A protein has these predicted regions:
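Conserved C-terminal guanine-recognition region of P-loop GTPase G domains, centered on the G4
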Residues: 74-137
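Helical mechanochemical/support elements of P-loop NTPase systems and associated helical scaffolds
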Residues: 97-101, 122, 142, 184-187, ...
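Canonical P-loop GTPase G-domain recognition
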Residues: 114, 118-173
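Signal for well-folded cores of large energy- and translation-related assemblies
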Residues: 106, 151-154, 171, 184, ...
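Charged, alpha-helix-enriched surfaces in structured cytosolic catalytic cores
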Residues: 36, 96, 100, 161, ...
Length: 333
């Protein structure tokens, strides 16, 4: 009897950590505006053109992604916003870059988030700026209220086939290829066989980590690190997508893609069919041309393979523009 109890205790001690990690909740934010508050919210981790801060509580892992190369690079702003489910807009001044950040959040239909502002910022002017955008219902809070509200949030989990856009990839000696990203839909388990798009290569998930802890399974919207077999980090680009091998939702396009089209009222130029633009879809940034069907319908012609699903939001960018660099938005048909 004692031996049986000891065996049960040993088994419990082995299994409980895995069970706890499997059941860990995940909530992911983007911080735009003044991102100095990030260090008060979490510990700085992965840093490239994006910095990712994280914090683990008893049952939840929080992450905050910051586009540290913005405003110099509009691309990092678009990628950071597409990684998260919730947004924090921290305003210390009203200028054209704030306008771009509002346009970025609006372009991907952000509807849940929080706004903080310094004493010098006129709240009424700020509310006027965000009027008629998807962030018009964001809550205005101070720092203490923000922390309270974040602790009450629920994860935005999506069931279905696995969709995991990759935001970082690198080789680790003795481990092999490691990819980082947020599971946008579905789940991933150790030894799952997945496909990476747009290349179509088959990969094997060797191991999984959340917040540097090993786990055997994780679900949307977990931020994870996967050790994988079947692809080298040098062959992976940011925005490549890991998915179920028999994915029905994701498509890879090299030809024209029909899409809705709304030109930004803040862009004063004309969009021409012979001009090359940059499209932001998920966390992909790819060169494209456009062809008009009518005033609110276009065809997007990618110059490189583009991964997408029907109904996905996109933003059209002109990175070298002196004014606003987010020049249009729409929904892929």
């Amino acid at each position: 009897m004692r031996l049986k109890l000891q065996s049960q205790t040993i088994l419990t001690n082995i299994l409980l950590p895995c069970i706890r990690h499997t059941l860990m909740k995940s909530i992911n934010f983007v911080i735009v505006g003044d991102y100095q508050i990030a260090s008060d919210l979490g510990k700085k981790g992965t840093t490239t053109d994006l910095s990712i801060y994280d914090r683990k509580t008893q049952d939840t892992i929080f992450t905050w992604t910051v586009p540290i190369t913005f405003p110099d690079k509009i691309q990092s702003l678009m990628q950071a916003t597409n990684i998260a489910e919730y947004a924090i807009l921290n305003v210390t001044k009203i200028d054209k870059y704030l306008g771009e950040q509002v346009l970025a959040l609006d372009a991907i239909n952000f509807s849940e988030g929080f706004i903080l502002h310094s004493y010098e910022v006129d709240e009424m002017k700020l509310k006027t700026l965000i009027k008629n955008t998807t962030i018009s219902d964001f809550q205005f809070l101070d720092n203490d209220q923000l922390k309270q509200q974040m602790s009450r949030l629920k994860p935005k989990s999506r069931e279905g086939e696995c969709i995991l856009p990759i935001d970082h990839a690198f080789n680790v000696k003795g481990v092999g290829t490691v990819v980082l990203g947020v599971i946008k839909q579905g789940a991933v388990k150790t030894f799952d066989r997945l496909k990476i798009l747009p290349s179509g290569k088959d990969i094997l998930v060797k191991s999984i980590q959340m917040h540097d802890d090993p786990v055997t399974e994780c679900k949307s919207p977990a931020r994870v690190g996967l050790a994988v077999k079947g692809v080298d980090a040098a062959d992976i680009s940011r925005g490549d997508v890991l998915c179920s091998p028999d994915s029905l939702n994701l498509k890879v396009a090299t030809d024209a893609i029909p899409a809705g089209f709304i030109k930004s009222p803040y862009y004063k130029g004309n969009l021409t069919e012979n001009q090359t633009y940059v499209i932001s879809v998920g966390i992909q940034i790819k060169p494209v041309k456009i062809k008009y069907n009518n005033a609110d319908r276009i065809e997007i012609i990618p110059e490189k393979s583009l991964v997408f699903f029907s109904g996905q939001s996109y933003a059209l960018l002109k990175p070298d523009n002196v004014g606003t660099r987010i020049i249009a938005k729409g929904i892929i048909q």
